[in-house]
Amino acid sequence: MVTKESIEVIAQSIGLSTLSPDVSAALAPDVEYRVREVMQVYHQLQLYFCPLISSLTCRRNLQEAIKCMRHARRTTLMAHDVDSALHFRNLEPTSGSKSMRFKRAPENRDLYFFDDKDVELKNVIEAPLPNAPPDASVFLHWLAIDGIQPSIPQNSPLQAISDLKRSEYKDDGLAARQVLSKDLQIYFDKVTEWALTQSGSTLFRQALASLEIDPGLHPLVPFFTSFIAEEIVKNMDNYPILLALMRLARSLLHNPHVHIEPYLHQLMPSIITCLIAKRLGRRSSDNHWDLRNFTASTVASTCKRFGHVYHNLLPRVTRSLLHTFLDPTKALPQHYGAIQGMVALGLNMVRFLVLPNLGPYLLLLLPEMGLEKQKEEAKRHGAWLVYGALMVAAGRCLYERLKTSETLLSPPTSSVWKTNGKLTSPRQSKRKASSDNLTHQPPLKKIAVGGIIQMSSTQMQMRGTTTVPQQSHTDADARHHNSPSTIAPKTSAAAGTDVDNYLFPLFEYFGESMLMFTPTHELSFFL
């Protein structure tokens, strides 16, 4: 195993160049004996501590390493060949081992040395000093913002999903199954199932309560909004499902912990649909009026909460409601939804949008309330509900104006009492007087984002023979300066005349019913 030449080479490597051949021949058997003793002890320890490792395994590893060496077209076995062999056999490679490149001495073929690179001392002295290691410090950065990891150097990029992993999809094909946890998937499936099949159950009510307060539901917001938008389109003739979807949308909008602003553009059209749609539900017994009332309050709360984030949200909603209210071709349930929506948005909407158009609208509504011209009971019932909504809206506006007005009331030019206590159509003289008053009233107010609301020919016919006077530039500029992002109110000079303009026409339209909305102090004026 150990020859005398090997002893001579080892002696020369440690500086013993005068070793005689006799000494080398005597040392070789002794070194070989001691190496065998060490190998025997190592073999015994290996069998004692690692009985699973045998010489056959070592031989196979060596064979694999030789294969790696030959594939690399080399004749020298290196450390990374052994590492590759262990890797191929699914074993942990060794660490700390490195192959060194030795050069053969030209004078002696059996002598090898490591070729170190010569370095000039001058270059070492003149080399710049390395940078001092920085002090230990802590840096803050965002791991995620609204559930989305920002692309910054501190955050490692997301690893690509392995092709070996299967993506879990349901029949609906939602790609969300890749980003939602198992708990959120089960939660979403259960809530959507209860909304479609068990909307009146206790479980669904508890789920709605959870949606209003749970702070961990932000990953589900885009999927709930998509679900609501899709199911409303599919179930326009199913009243229970529409009501359940509106309750679901309201719970999401009331949750202060979720970031729902980016999804309002997808959610608001569906909500507005449930407010001013022509038909909600299939059966005549479906109480779609309550659904419209519930949706109106949802629209108002949404505009109140997110109006400062999206400045065009309130003008766009108001414009949609006003167009529906002024369109005589729309059905009475649509008018009812538009009126309730504007009432829920605030009394200023009623004052600026509903009251100026109240007289012409009642001229078209009164025939629908009478048995003589309207034979269908359902349409008469709808007309009376619209009439009641207008009366409540006008009464609330009247009450607030009387409470805040500091001007003295001027006496009416005609009697404001109805003699028989029943709703009757105004006389022709009153119609003419009402039309004359409308010519002096301000036009529809300007919405800052939407601009002047243009009226179609059918809407102009709804006003009868009245015409809208042109606004002066001074008046329009003053209103636009006072309120840049909402419907422009009247100027302070004309604010005091609103009571005189609308008070007595309201008593003519609704009779003694307005007394319910008159404050006690102002009521003495009529007694």
UniProtKB/Swiss-Prot annotation:
Q: Where is the composition biased (Polar residues)?
A: 416-427, 462-473
- Keyword presence, Heme: no
Subcellular localization, per the record?
Nucleus
Q: Which GO terms describe its molecular function?
A: protein heterodimerization activity; RNA polymerase II general transcription initiation factor activity
- GO CC annotation: what is one? transcription factor TFIID complex
Tissue-specificity statement: Expressed in roots, leaves, inflorescences and siliques.
SMART domains, per database record: TAF
Q: Where is this region: Disordered?
A: 410-442, 462-492
The record's note on quaternary structure and interaction partners says: Component of the TFIID complex. TFIID is composed of TATA binding protein (TBP) and a number of TBP-associated factors (TAFs) whose MWs range from 14-217 kDa. Interacts with TAF5 and TAF9.
Q: Which family does it belong to?
A: Belongs to the TAF6 family.
User: What is the recorded function of this protein according to its Swiss-Prot or TrEMBL entry?
Assistant: TAFs are components of the transcription factor IID (TFIID) complex that is essential for mediating regulation of RNA polymerase transcription. Not redundant with TAF6.
Protein name as catalogued: Transcription initiation factor TFIID subunit 6b
